[in-house]
Amino acid sequence: MCSTPGGKWHIVSGRTQEHVAPYMAVGLSTVVHGIGSRQDIERNLRIVEDGIHAAVSIIGINMPVRLIALAEGALTGFTDEIFDIPHVTAARDLFIDIPGPETDRLAALARQYDTYIVAQCKARWPEVIDKRFFNTLFVISRQGEIVHKAAKNHLWCRERSCVPHDVYDRWVELFGDGIDAFYPVLRTDDIGNIGTICCSDGEYPEAVRALAFNGAEVVYRPSEAVPMTQMGMEPGGTWLLQNRAHAHFNNVYMVCPNVGPVYVHPRMEHPYDIAGGNSHIVDYQGNVLGHTASGANTFVAGIIDIEALRQFRTMNLNSNWMKDLRTEIFRRMYSEPVHPKNLWLNADPLQHADVDEIYRENIGRLVARGSFTPPAQAFPGARYIAPSESPEDADWAQVRALWPEPAEE
């Protein structure tokens, strides 16, 4: 089956499920080179290809590899976020279409190794809205077909991707307003039901719960800047803590590859490890199956047993928590908005400093409602500090000069 936002699933009562054989899932952590044009993605693709060849050769001797997961940024990096490039400019000059030549390369690998590939990439979605890009999650089948496509729904404060909520009315017009419109799940007969979120999405318990309600059994959550979100003494910091909790509360597997060190631009002598490694795979009870401390061109692997998960969910009278939910008592909790919708439906997305003010207004709403209690004394809060040569739209050429001129096509 193919899943896209708003896709409907038809369940046949009493149907006997086919047995899903255990399989190996692999998460890649690859070194990333920032891109100055779409052509620069080629370099990252070569690194990903080498990583897939190596990982399958090494881990495939244990059990068939049926799911390979790439980290966030593995293809397109983070140029737009780091340099605060205007959204429309980044959509035009940097990002891809799905399907396209880049996904065709991954499709060839999926066919070669008889595996699904799940990945993230910033991509245009013109059938939704023009001159925008979305942080997009997609799955390629063993036959090399794109069978799932979803958008990231929550951003950290320095990401300027468009999300469905930013163009809410248009999104609902196309896909409806059900859970499946925002958290579609890919249902397969050979690797289980796959849900996808990305990085900041996982800071909200509702995201994985929505996928679980929609049938997800394996959830892909790539990348987190672990040092930024509190590392602490435990490997993986709060990122691993969150993913173990997601797995435990929802009885899902979590497949979580972290991005490797990043060369922001070609003139950097050394890459910067912005994410801190600690890729992991967690089982449906919250146990860590695989953990890799390093993030520098390596991988994490773990065995996924869908049949065991299904038995656990349906035989259990205790720790399959979703069965106990009293949904009516939570219904009004979200009746009042926090973040405004449709911000970029009729206006171009703003840059970092201006968006900071939107977040401050959100904080103000929570204070006004009594959700947040203000401190006794107010101090200046976090703010955007521009680099010495902050690029406005007219200065994109100056930033672009950090990269060699792309070859003529």
Put a short name on every predicted segment.
Residues 48-62, 106:
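A short, N-terminal amphipathic alpha-helix
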Residues 74-92, 128-133:
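Metal-dependent catalytic neighborhoods of phosphoester/phosphodiester hydrolases
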Residues 89-104, 169-175, 240:
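A short acidic, glycine-rich active-site loop
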Residues 14-27, 184-195:
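Beta-strand-turn-beta hairpins that frame and shape the catalytic cleft
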Residues 119-121, 135-139, 184-186, 279-281, ...:
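Short beta-strand scaffold segments in enzyme catalytic cores
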Residues 98-118, 193, 199-300, 402-408:
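CN hydrolase (nitrilase-like) catalytic-core segments centered on the catalytic cysteine
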Residues 2-11, 253, 258-409:
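C-terminal beta-strand edge segments of enzyme domains
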Residues 108, 125-245:
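Active-site catalytic loop in hydrolytic enzyme cores
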